[in-house]
């Protein structure tokens, strides 16, 4: 049995496959995912698992150099933004939500959580450990 934090097979696989500058999306249950994007669906029920819990676990195993958030999170979900900022110690770029939806087609995968709060979506840009 895997000893690390992330034990979901698909999520572990995509994290291991990430290269420098690759993107991984994590988001709420309502985020529309392009048909050609690999969707790792972790949602069980409303807010289970939460966006923050999944983000914490992914950050424990993935080297991240930059993140992208929807500009709208600043006004529509400031509490979630505050929690994200407490976890992230890399540059944050704010982009329009519509741009984030388009950028999902550039990700290695999108991780769907059970989160039911608006604009709880993030794109993680992979860094290197050296």
From Swiss-Prot:
GO biological process: D-ribose catabolic process
Active site (record annotation): 20 (proton donor)
GO MF term (any one): monosaccharide binding
Keyword Secreted: no
Keyword line: Carbohydrate metabolism, Cytoplasm, Isomerase
Major place of residence: cytoplasm
Cellular component terms per the entry's GO annotation: cytosol
Enzyme Commission number, as recorded: 5.4.99.62
Catalytic activity line of the entry: beta-D-ribopyranose = beta-D-ribofuranose
UniProt superkingdom: Bacteria
Pathway entry: Carbohydrate metabolism; D-ribose degradation; D-ribose 5-phosphate from beta-D-ribopyranose: step 1/2
Annotated compartments: Cytoplasm
Pfam family of the protein (one): RbsD_FucU
Residues where substrate binds: 28, 97, 119-121
Function, as annotated: Catalyzes the interconversion of beta-pyran and beta-furan forms of D-ribose.
Oligomer and partners: Homodecamer.
Family named by the database record: Belongs to the RbsD / FucU family. RbsD subfamily.
Protein name: D-ribose pyranase
Organism: Lacticaseibacillus paracasei (strain ATCC 334 / BCRC 17002 / CCUG 31169 / CIP 107868 / KCTC 3260 / NRRL B-441) (Lactobacillus paracasei)
């Amino acid at each position: 049995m895997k000893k690390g934090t992330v034990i979901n097979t698909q999520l572990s696989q995509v994290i291991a496959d990430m290269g420098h500058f690759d993107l991984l999306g994590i988001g709420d249950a309502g985020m529309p995912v392009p048909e050609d994007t690999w969707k790792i669906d972790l949602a069980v029920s409303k807010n289970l698992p939460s966006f923050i819990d999944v983000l914490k676990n992914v950050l424990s195993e993935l080297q991240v150099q930059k993140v992208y958030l929807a500009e709208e999170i600043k006004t529509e979900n400031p509490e979630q933004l505050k929690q994200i900022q407490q976890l992230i110690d890399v540059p944050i770029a704010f982009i329009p939500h519509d741009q984030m939806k388009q950028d999902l087609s550039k990700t290695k995968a999108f991780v769907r959580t059970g989160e039911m709060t608006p604009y709880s979506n993030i794109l993680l840009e992979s860094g290197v450990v050296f």
